[in-house]
Each structure stands twice: as C-alpha cells, then as structure tokens.
Regions:
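Short, P/G- and charge-enriched loop/turn segments at secondary-structure junctions
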Residues: 29-34, 107-108, 167-168
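Histidine-centered divalent metal-coordination motifs
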Residues: 88-96, 173, 177, 239
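Residue-level marker for buried hydrophobic side chains located in beta-strands
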Residues: 53-55, 88, 119, 189-191
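Zn-dependent metallo-beta-lactamase
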Residues: 1-50, 223, 250
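Core dinuclear metal-dependent hydrolase active-site scaffold
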Residues: 2-8, 43-47, 53, 156-185
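Active-site metal-binding motif and surrounding structural segment of the metallo-beta-lactamase
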Residues: 66-120
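Metallo-beta-lactamase
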Residues: 59, 75, 113-169, 216-233, ...
C-alpha cells in the first residue's frame, strides 16, 4: 500500500469553530488568537492492489479556478479523482466531510465529489448531524448522501469492508466517530481521525476539551500506541503539522 497526505493547509481554530488559514512558518506563529489551536487539515489517499481509497474529504473549499481542493491535490499526485473507488468517512464534522460534495460555481447545484466511488458512512452519525447541525453549508454538503446510490450505510459498531478496511466506532470525539485499519499483504495503515489526530497526543496523557469524551479518546490513544508498536502500524495523522504519517520504531 502507498499512502499520501492531501494537505489543504494549516488553520487556526478557536471557540467559534471557524477555520482561519494560518502560516505556521510566519513570525506570528506563536501569536495566533488566544484560546485557539493550530491544526493541519489533510485527508489521505491510499493506493492498494485494487483500490484508490480516500480517508475523509477535507473542508470542501474550491480554488480560484473553481476546482475542488481535494481534486487538485489528487491530480498533483497524478491521480484522476474519477478513479477513486472508496471514500471512508470517520465522522461528519466540517473539516472532515466538507468535500463530500460541492456547490458547482456555474450551475449552483450540489454535485457529489466522487461519483464513481462508494462512500462508507455511519448511518447514526449522518442522522445525528442532519438533525442537530445548524450549519446550512455542511447540511447541503452531506445531505446529498441521502439520495446518492453510491452510499454504503454502516450500521454496526465494527466491521470489515471488502476484506480490506476494518472499522470500529470509538466515540470520544463525537458519539459515532469511527476509525479504520487498512490491511493488505501483512501491512497495516491506521487512521484514527480526530481521536488520534496528532503524533504528540499519542505520546502523552492529553485530554482534549474539544472532544465529547476527552478521557475516552486519551485511553484509546494509549491502547493504539502500544498495539501499533507491536504490529508495526503506519499511523495517519489528520491534523498533524509536519508529521502526517508515522511508524513506531520498535526500539523505543
């Protein structure tokens, strides 16, 4: 398997939950808004023997040419977005699910971003967000899934997709947040999404205030760090600036 981050940039985010572009190499780096955190937003693409898999879809921003950012990032790697076969959604917060679909700048219609792919989505996560979110843009972006023939609704707490993607609901960050292990040819890539978003959090007993249950997330990270070392996982960190993937050295 090959894995590539599809970075959409660094962002400062505070209690308003608005993602503001932030240059982490600028002299103002230590002086971001009070109470904010600095994150990278980076979906991943994994190329296996038979599939091109997306892990989450980013913010859903369009570039100046009206091209979806995640499409541009894929094409920069030589990957035709229409060739993506699977899209796995960890949860449906804006920074992970915004690229599910996009508003066409000319037709002003919502288009599914990867029409030839299967979208794997937790049904309970979808229902919860559609019922409780007050963000009309997000609701439009994810709402198209209801009538899209390519959706595979996941209804179990854990399972296996095509003997390749092993998933499990963890909670922690959101009630139906799920993680995934891609397993092929004795190789394991682990995607912990927002329960395991950054390398540094794996190494400490960090409890995040932005989690629904920060203690539960911390306990998951400790468990995965130990198991990942034993089984030589490659970790994919969605929000890590500078360290998108990491494989634990068994000597540490």
């Amino acid at each position: 398997m090959r894995i590539y981050p599809l970075s959409e940039g660094s962002f400062s985010i505070d209690e308003t939950k608005v993602f503001k572009p932030f240059n982490s190499s600028s002299p103002d780096y230590p002086n971001r808004p009070k109470g904010s955190i600095l994150v990278e937003v980076q979906p991943f693409v994994i190329i296996t023997d038979n599939d091109i898999i997306l892990l989450d879809t980013g913010l859903g921003y369009l570039n100046k040419m009206g091209v979806l950012q995640i499409h541009e990032n894929l094409m920069a790697l030589g990957i035709d977005p229409s060739k993506v076969t699977k899209v796995f959604l960890s949860h449906l917060h804006k920074d992970h699910a915004g690229g599910i679909s996009y508003l066409h700048p000319v037709h002003q219609e919502q288009f599914i971003s990867f029409p030839y792919a299967k979208y794997y989505v937790q049904r309970r996560e979808f229902d919860e967000v559609m019922k409780n979110s007050h963000n009309p843009t997000l609701l439009a972006q994810i709402g198209v899934l209801e009538n899209f023939s390519g959706v595979v609704w996941l209804t179990q707490d854990k399972g296996v997709i095509d003997n390749l993607i092993h998933y499990e609901i963890t909670g922690g960050h959101s009630e139906f947040h799920q993680v995934a292990w891609m397993k092929e040819n004795e190789e394991i890539i682990f995607f912990g999404a927002d329960v395991a978003p950054q390398l540094q959090q794996m190494k400490s007993r960090f409890v995040a205030k932005y989690d629904m249950d920060g203690k539960k997330s911390m306990e998951w990270r400790q468990q995965w760090w130990v198991t990942g070392a034993k089984e030589q996982w490659t970790f994919a960190f969605y929000h890590d600036i500078g360290q998108p993937t990491f494989r634990i050295d068994t000597t540490i």
